[in-house]
Amino acid sequence: MAQRFYLLLLLLIFLVNLICFSSQQDLSFVFNGFNQDQAGDELLLDGFARIQSPERVLQLTDGTTQQKGHAFFNRPFDFGSASSQSLSFFTQFVCALVPKPGFYGGHGIAFVLSSAHNLKKAYASSYLGLFNRSTNGSPSSHVLAVELDTVQSAETDDMDNNHVGIDENRIQSVVSASASYYSDREGKNISLILLSGDPIQVWVDYEDTLLNVTLAPLRNQKPSKPLLSRTINLTAIFPDRKAFVGFSAATGSSISNQYILGWSFSRSRRLLKSLDISELSTVPLFTEQKRKRSPLLIVLLVILTLVVIGGLGGYYLYRRKKYAEVREPWEKEYGPLRYSYESLYKATKGFNKDGRLGKGGFGEVYKGSLPLVGDIAVKRLSHNAEQGMKQFVAEVVTMGSLQHKNLVPLLGYCRRKGELLLVSKYMEGGSVDQYLFNGDKPPLSWSQRLAILRDIASALCYLHTGASQVVLHRDIKASNVMFDDHGANLSATAAVGTIGYMALELISTGTSTKTDVYAFGAFMLEVTCGRRPFDPEMPVEKRHLVKWVCECWRKHSLVDAIDTRLRDKFTLGEVEMVLKLGLLCTSIIPESRPNMEKVMQYINRDQALPDFSPDTPGIGVSTPMVMGIPGLAITSTSVTSSASVPLVSPPSTNNSMFISHTILNGDGR
């Protein structure tokens, strides 16, 4: 009796296992095309996914951006009690990825095993409708996918824009390869374009923990070698031992229609039914949905169009007035040197006050930046008189042709009604007066100071004798001599600076050069003594620098006039020569001043100074009224003018106007 009971119990256990095994074996199906009656009941669709009739295809996405679609078999694939080694499944499907004509589409399609069929929270685009940023890479995602990806994304570490990959719980593939298939006839892999619109066969086989992915064109037999192979523990990804099988597809900014033409699935290789290629539908052509526009919408579009046209017309008139310029036929010959007002307006950010470099008697200077040119300085000058403008522009252009290693040429000009704009290169270094009078700058060595003087003398000599016509500077002072490169390497190289760069003052031609010689002499004393030409804070006897230096010479103590910050680190003979030359250049008798060619010879020690003393007439006189010479002025800016030539010419019709230039390089002496 007991023996019979045990036999019945064993038989019952066998029948239960047989039923379970049979239920697992039953998960086999084939769709040789999709129709609404059969596939509509057996597939779970979401997103855009739909069965398209009468084409009998499963469409996952349409021709719109940021779209996704999912299609899963309505019953999960139940692993049962099978071990990971004995677990297996086999599937074959035919897909087609059809781009919009003339465009490159995306993003791709994936065969999916997922613990849940609801992936509505997943992202489209490069996530292929499988993950979002929070689920991507999470073990709780429980997703295994074989992706056919047609867009290369840096975010997902894609190898190219035409690859196949295996994804485990993340969109970044654990293994991938460029799409191709093995040709048994040729014995090599042949490239396959996924986004061609042509049908492609895909086989995904999982057996003995090995997942193989194989591709081939529609009419080819299954190749003997897979494209991808990967050992995968399926039960580790799906601990509850169940998974839905199906497809996911997505578009991003690039679009395509993505279709499944047929699908076969089985847990057994032997029971897997091959697709009947002859029964599959052809790939539908790419069509965009046509939407009917209501009359109201048409009216609104017309009104909107008129509003836009009116707005654009108003904006055009506003811009035309805002950027209006004055152009005359005679200016055509200067065309290459003329800048548009709009370009200068934008370069200076609307002449923003934050970019203002300085303000002088004739206008303001702004910093700007032009493409292919770099940083510039733009001087805005008021000029209401049209008479003489042609001569003025001609001379400005002539000034732009000056070339000297210590001069930056004028880049160009622009003019509007009542306004003239002059453009020159911008040099970023600080001015000499900042190094002489500000404590936050390192003091200049004597060799640097001498190099500055030699460079400026060279530039002035060129303006007076080397150009096609005599050019006066008439605003030489420490604040107008600037260092390039923020004064970098001052200890190793000569100072680099500018003449009149910050002020961009106007100059004249064809008149006496002695005004520049006087100004240069005052500048020599300023650089050597480290003092301003006129300092009201000093004692009366030291207030005028020219007079005080002459008095030191008279007392045989020129060394007392030298900048104390030099700390005896100078050549006494050089310093005394510079101080005496400065006094000679500042003689209030113009005929007694040397020309700049002579100054160059003196300062370079090519010729000795002429004999003169502190008591020589015109030497060391700080005010012109002592000599009774009317019209001669010596200002606190260390610049003088002769009676026949005013120091700074007012903007009149009889005055030629030029922009000053920039010293580029010292010679390191």
Curated annotation (Swiss-Prot):
InterPro entries: ConA-like_dom_sf, Kinase-like_dom_sf, L-type_Lectin-RKs, Legume_lectin_dom, Prot_kinase_dom, Protein_kinase_ATP_BS, Ser-Thr/Tyr_kinase_cat_dom, Ser/Thr_kinase_AS. It is a single-pass type I membrane protein. Its EC number is 2.7.11.1. Glycans are attached at N132, N189, N212, N233. SMART domains: S_TKc (SM00220). Residues 1-24 form the signal peptide. This is Probable L-type lectin-domain containing receptor kinase I.2. It comes from Arabidopsis thaliana.
